[in-house]
Amino acid sequence: MAFSFYGGIHPKDRKDLAREQAIVAFPPPATVVIPMSQHIGAPCKPLVSKGDHVDLGQKIGDGPGLCAPVHASVSGTVQAVEARPHPNGTTVLSVVIANDFQETVSPEVRPRADLSGLSAGNLMDIIREAGIVGLSLIHI
């Protein structure tokens, strides 16, 4: 079920820069680098190794404690698990995936038809496994 809300953000400045521009689909990259550290909690430990095939949405990193799982954003082959530059200026362990452009979705990704019968604990487990973090960037 999709939720909607009233309002939104309505910036007044600089709309003229994009108003007449067409929306362009951004092509998927040939290679993705997925950092195992994506929030202020503990970094994930990789669950995949060089040469492994991964599917889109497959969990590729996880760990105990204050850690949110990380998932593959493409399907393809793991080229490396190595330290790479991170946007925060550090170097972090990352999973490098060669995109196969098949967009094969992992069987781990499945819709949940009815959430109303689940306990709060079950919902929290589902949210955590999805890698969802709060505004504080800590897993919920």
Where is each model-derived feature located?
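N-terminal, Lys/Arg-enriched amphipathic/low-complexity engagement segments
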Residues: 1-43, 47
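Aromatic/His-enriched, Gly/Pro-containing loop or helix-boundary segments
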Residues: 42-47, 64, 106-112
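Short histidine-centered loop motifs in beta-beta connectors
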Residues: 44-53, 57
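Short hydrophobic beta/alpha edge segments that flank linear recognition/processing sites
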Residues: 54-67, 82, 93-99
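Small beta-strand-rich domains/subdomains or short beta-sheet motifs embedded
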Residues: 69-73
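Conserved hydrophobic positions within beta-strands
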Residues: 76-78
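Acidic low-complexity segments
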Residues: 87-135
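Conserved small/polar residues in nucleotide/adenosyl-binding loops
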Residues: 138-140
